[in-house]
Regions:
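Immediate flanking context of iron-sulfur cluster ligation sites
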Residues: 86-99
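A short, polar/charged loop-to-alpha-helix boundary motif
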Residues: 62-74, 79
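Short beta-strand scaffold segments in enzyme catalytic cores
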Residues: 43-52
Length: 174
């Protein structure tokens, strides 16, 4: 074993989900597959009200729109936020196929969404992305953003890691 391997922190452990959370996270993962099929990065998001009403769904549309902010989470929030009040969103859950980036975590904070469930974590995503500078992220956890929030944002993940990882295989430049 190399010295580097012994200094790396362990990958986050998978979190078990109940039937409802699993169903909606799988819906977000299916949207990630659609995003990839359309030439985008493979990410999907679903926002669900406390009563189970679907408020919004979206996939990453960077590739097809050229909009660097067209991440799945921000796109879903752009649909849900004007149509539903802050109280509804505070009780809602955003399901994301991947751990939200710092931009998306900020949008989740500003939208008042109170709960996030995500699939593949940022550490595992970085392994798919490789070392190319044009594919790097800010390396700031969404939990860091959520922990700085004056209102609570529950964060559950990583979950369904193998399912959430599948659409990333071969999707990133070597």
């Amino acid at each position: 074993m190399s010295a580097l391997a012994t200094t790396l922190p362990p990958l986050p452990a998978e979190v078990p989900l109940d039937e409802r959370d699993g169903r909606y996270l799988r819906q977000a993962i299916a949207l990630a597959d659609q995003a990839r099929a359309r030439g985008n990065r493979p990410f999907g998001a679903v926002i669900v009200a406390a009563d189970g009403t679907l408020l919004a769904e979206a996939w990453n549309a960077n590739g097809e729109t050229g909009d660097c902010t067209a991440h799945a989470e921000t796109s879903a929030i752009r649909v849900a936020s004007p149509a539903h009040g802050r109280d509804t969103l505070a009780a809602a859950t955003l399901y994301s196929s991947g751990e939200p980036c710092v931009m998306c975590a900020g949008a989740i904070f500003w939208s008042n969404i109170g709960r996030v469930v995500y699939g593949i974590d940022a550490e595992r995503l970085r392994a798919f992305r490789g070392e190319r500078q044009d594919q790097r992220d800010a390396e700031l956890s969404c939990r860091d953003v959520f922990n700085a929030s004056p209102h609570p944002i529950a964060c559950i993940g990583p979950a369904l890691i193998d399912e959430a990882s599948a659409s990333h295989v071969g999707a990133w430049k070597a």
